[in-house]
């Protein structure tokens, strides 16, 4: 190799540095003394960092450092979720899932949260919602849910029933809105909420849905029954759930209670609506609690034995005979609710042998007699003696006091397994709302299919004997229908198209229009 500067070939080597230089011009020869530092007898070593280590000054290699940081993250997450005693179990699960490699990145905290949730659900001794886990690990529910499913499937875990009652109790205990409520009233809220939550479970209001909105709805209802001024907006905000969903659950719960009033045969059931069902909650809760405590006598057919001494006729008579409890006194600072049932009064409800189904005429007669006494008789005169104590007819059944009608002795006031809960009778047997909506949708599609067939038949086989008057009348009628907004919509057109392509009606009723159009109309399923 010649010198790049003078093109000479006389090179000499420096004794001190060992570098070659040109004897003519003194230019150093490039790459003459180069040694690769990627291997050799001195071990794996790079130019700036040692190969296999995490950086300058570290004594741990990459894998050890990754496992060390992963363990620290697991410990921090379990401490925030109050699962410090389950740290080693969660570490073992993650090690098994990752073949001992653990991990780094945005997916790893989600995996930790999924394992925490799976451990709690598998043992069934604690309460941990997915919303709480997602908040602590900093992810969305749609990211956490699939990860939990993968963990459960990979480890072949069997999760127990979700403890909605425990979640309700935890929410009440930790709610900042109830810190000023006295201990006795908070205990009553927990018991009544547990009872109503079990009823909601029996009515399938939680089936296939997120649990937290239902918990907020039940809590909002119960605190109003007990006279605590807390808005559902604040409870939803504290629980970090959608306010719209919470209000929907609240409405569904109110609708079920209205149906309970109809099923148990209250004489004033026609006056109970979704808007005022809260005012009648004392009556409904007392009836539902008493009804849930009755047991069927074995070996005697349909004969019933009541363990709580409950009888509908005695209950109504006892309610209507206590005149003093329907007088509203401002000075007494009573709750703005009437006391329908006084189970701790002088005359307790006695066991009776009347038929379980009392005629509605008897109950209505007693109710009308009581209402007449209120309007122009005995009870109305009570308001004439004091200027501050008066009778308000609008609030006859608009006041409920939770002090007397609530017993809290029913098994529904504590957590029950779903199979035991379904055997209880609370006055109403309901189907899941999603199932009801599905049946309604199928019936609607069935009617649309019939209408589509009629339209197709009218076009394919028009009547030859239609007079001009009948035709003009039909056109006028169609114009009126269009004005009312009842014209054919997109669903009618899709169903009509599928009917023209001879698609099975049962498949159309399922509502998978896009798939059916691809298969039968656009032929996208052909290979």
From Swiss-Prot:
One annotated GO molecular function: protein homodimerization activity
Residue ranges covered by zinc fingers (TFIIB-type): 1-30
Pfam family, one: BRF2-like_C_cyclin_rpt
GO cellular component, one term: nucleus
Disruption phenotype: Embryonic lethality and aborted seed when homozygous.
Tissue specificity annotation: Expressed in shoot apical meristems, root tips, primordia of lateral roots, inflorescences, developing pollen grains and embryos.
Keyword annotations from UniProtKB, A to Z: Metal-binding, Nucleus, Transcription, Transcription regulation, Zinc, Zinc-finger
UniProt-annotated location(s): Nucleus
Listed GO biological process terms: embryo development ending in seed dormancy; pollen germination
Biological function: Plant-specific TFIIB-related protein that plays important roles in pollen germination and embryogenesis, possibly by regulating gene expression through interaction with TBP2 and the subunits of RNA polymerases. Binds double-stranded DNA in vitro.
Subunit structure: Can form homodimer. Interacts with TBP2.
Name of the molecule in the record: Plant-specific TFIIB-related protein PTF2
Protein species of origin: Arabidopsis thaliana
